[in-house]
Amino acid sequence: MAVQQNKKSPSKRGMHRSHDFLTAAPLAVEPSTGEVHLRHHVSPNGYYRGKKVVKTKND
């Protein structure tokens, strides 16, 4: 089992953890409907990059 040789100071511990935060998912607005969706995903209305690509229940 690995055992540390020297204690890591609170400052170094904080520097090590500085990139552990979560980031918000990037969102995009569908140009044809104005709906917000995840980037590179089809919007709930079935549109992707201004074109209808999936049939929905309302269609």
Curated annotation (Swiss-Prot):
Where does the record place Basic residues bias? 49-59
Name of the protein in question: Large ribosomal subunit protein bL32
Q: List the disulfide bonds.
A: none
What GO MF annotations does this protein's record show?
structural constituent of ribosome
Where in this protein does the record put region Disordered? 1-23, 35-59
Organism ancestry: Bacteria, Pseudomonadati, Pseudomonadota, Betaproteobacteria, Burkholderiales
The superkingdom listed in its UniProt entry is: Bacteria
GO annotation (BP), single: translation
Q: State the organism named in the record.
A: Paraburkholderia xenovorans (strain LB400)
**Keywords from the UniProt entry:** Ribonucleoprotein, Ribosomal protein
Q: Which Pfam families match?
A: Ribosomal_L32p
**Is Ribonucleoprotein one of the keywords?**
yes
Q: Transmembrane: present as a keyword of the record?
A: no
Protein family (similarity comment): Belongs to the bacterial ribosomal protein bL32 family.
Choose one Gene Ontology CC annotation of this protein and give it.
large ribosomal subunit
